[in-house]
């Protein structure tokens, strides 16, 4: 694997620290008037998703992480594992609850997901940026009821709960941004 110096750190780069893979989310190179230059780096630990901020001297280096992002199709959940398939080789991979995390509430059958593999094992699953889900439960919106917050909670077919406008009803299909968990629009 390649070696990267701290001034080479860029958003999206995946490096190894303390034997674990991290993704660089932001990096700022600082050269003070007095003293040695350094880099302030925001990292995300790929195994747990926790965010860390570290400072590296300009002479510090890190090995590139041997992680692979693959586009896989979500097949099904057997209760313990979520199963994905590579559409080119038809090879199937299983991810556990730790790798899935909060993504489980956005996974639909046949959805294209990005699965990050480390040593051949899935460590994170990223659902599509937008999904279309049916509303299975929400309060009825009353005409002219605009004194409230302008929204109401709605339970979707996958169990996710999002805040939707008052005019949206049970049985309608809506588009949701999976990165923020927010309502985007109704689907015609």
Swiss-Prot record:
Classify the source by domain of life.
Bacteria
PTM per Swiss-Prot/TrEMBL: May be beta-lysylated on the epsilon-amino group of Lys-34 by the combined action of EpmA and EpmB, and then hydroxylated on the C5 position of the same residue by EpmC (if this protein is present). Lysylation is critical for the stimulatory effect of EF-P on peptide-bond formation. The lysylation moiety may extend toward the peptidyltransferase center and stabilize the terminal 3-CCA end of the tRNA. Hydroxylation of the C5 position on Lys-34 may allow additional potential stabilizing hydrogen-bond interactions with the P-tRNA.
Predominant location of this chain? cytoplasm
Question: What InterPro entries is this protein classified in?
Answer: Elong-fact-P_C, NA-bd_OB-fold, Rib_uL2_dom2, Transl_elong_fac_P/YeiP, Transl_elong_KOW-like, Transl_elong_P/YeiP_cen, Transl_elong_P/YeiP_CS, Transl_elongation_fac_P
Hey, which family's this protein in?
A: Belongs to the elongation factor P family.
Stated role: Involved in peptide bond synthesis. Alleviates ribosome stalling that occurs when 3 or more consecutive Pro residues or the sequence PPG is present in a protein, possibly by augmenting the peptidyl transferase activity of the ribosome. Modification of Lys-34 is required for alleviation.
The name under which this protein is listed is: Elongation factor P
Q: Which gene encodes it?
A: efp
């Amino acid at each position: 694997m390649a070696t990267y110096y701290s001034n080479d750190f860029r958003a999206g780069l995946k490096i190894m620290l303390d034997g674990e893979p991290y993704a660089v989310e932001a990096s700022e190179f600082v050269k003070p008037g007095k003293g040695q230059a350094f880099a302030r780096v925001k990292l995300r630990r790929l195994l747990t998703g926790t965010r860390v901020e570290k400072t590296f001297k300009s002479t510090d280096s890190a090995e590139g992480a041997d992680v692979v992002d693959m586009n896989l199709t979500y097949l099904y959940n057997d209760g313990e594992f979520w199963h994905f398939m590579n559409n080119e080789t038809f090879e199937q991979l299983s991810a556990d609850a730790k790798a899935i995390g909060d993504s489980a509430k956005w996974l639909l059958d046949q959805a294209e997901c990005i699965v990050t593999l480390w040593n051949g094992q899935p460590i994170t699953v990223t659902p599509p940026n937008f999904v279309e889900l049916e509303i299975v439960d929400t309060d009825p919106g009353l005409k002219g009821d605009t004194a409230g917050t302008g929204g109401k909670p709605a339970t979707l077919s996958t169990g996710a709960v999002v805040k939707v406008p008052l005019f949206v009803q049970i049985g309608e299909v809506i588009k949701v941004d999976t990165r923020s968990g927010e309502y985007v629009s109704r689907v015609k």
